[in-house]
Amino acid sequence: MGQKVSPMGLRVGINREWDAAWYAEKTQVANLLLEDLKIRKYINEVYAKAAISRVIIERVKGPNNKDRVKITLHTAKPGVVIGHEAETKNKVVKELGFITKKNIILNVVEVRRPELDATLVAKSIAEQLEARASFRRVQKVAIQRALKAGAKGAKTLISGRLGGAEIARSEGYNEGQVPLQTLRADVDYAVAEAHTTYGKLGIKVWIYKGEVFDVQPRAFQEEKKPAKKFNKKPVAAKPANKEEKSSKEVK
């Protein structure tokens, strides 16, 4: 039987960047990976209601060759992440510095169209299901909003005890195109969980935004060399030979 792979992992290095942008020696990879997991877990707990879409972690060297961790948060609610007079942000930076024992740089990037972000759409559906909303209506509304915001296609799938049924099942909706086999297609994918009184529901969301032709990942980017300029001089027409002229006159 054919199995579906993650559309995000399949496109890493083609039209999507890595969420962890750092290199390390072989002996340090495991420790740094565990550190990344702790950072992501803490951020997801503190900003559970802040509509966090993506967390990108970079490791750079600061002054005096000190290790620094640069964290970029993509969110639809930057005001909630930063807090009043950056109080929440400073608190998070302090706690993360205590966890990692390193200097933390926290940047916040606003997601201007949350309807086109699969992670935010999946989290929104999960919150509505926990509030006992209709699973059919929630999916249809999410797809309509995505298409209205400019998506070329959207697909949703909810699995579990839908409506409190004793037998679990899956039900989903799709509209437009969602080409999972086209690698240049910009397909955003996310998974979320909804904890209801009847059990746990799984939510999957696919959003197709169009094809990407000119964007290259960082690993394959090359410096563009300036084109060579050639000074082309106009070529003067050669005068006809006397013999050619005389032959034409004879004809």
UniProtKB/Swiss-Prot annotation:
Q: Does the keyword Glycoprotein apply?
A: no
GO cellular component terms, semicolon-separated = cytosolic small ribosomal subunit
Q: What Gene3D superfamilies would the database entry show?
A: 3.30.300.20, Ribosomal protein S3, C-terminal domain (3.30.1140.32)
Q: Where are the transmembrane segments?
A: none
Pfam families, A to Z: KH_2 (PF07650), Ribosomal_S3_C (PF00189)
Instruction: Extract the InterPro entries matched here.
Output: KH_dom, KH_dom-like_a/b, KH_dom_type_2, KH_sf_prok-type, Ribosomal_S3_C_sf, Ribosomal_uS3_bac-typ, Ribosomal_uS3_C, Ribosomal_uS3_CS
Tell me which UniProt keywords the record has, alphabetically. Ribonucleoprotein, Ribosomal protein, RNA-binding, rRNA-binding
Gene Ontology MF annotations: mRNA binding; rRNA binding; structural constituent of ribosome
- Which superkingdom? Bacteria
CDD domains registered for this protein in UniProt: KH-II_30S_S3
> Basic and acidic residues compositional bias: what residue ranges?
240-251
Region ranges (Disordered): 222-251
Q: What does this protein do?
A: Binds the lower part of the 30S subunit head. Binds mRNA in the 70S ribosome, positioning it for translation.
Q: How does it assemble?
A: Part of the 30S ribosomal subunit. Forms a tight complex with proteins S10 and S14.
Family, per the entry? Answer: Belongs to the universal ribosomal protein uS3 family.
| Protein name per the record | Small ribosomal subunit protein uS3
Specify the species. Anaeroplasma abactoclasticum
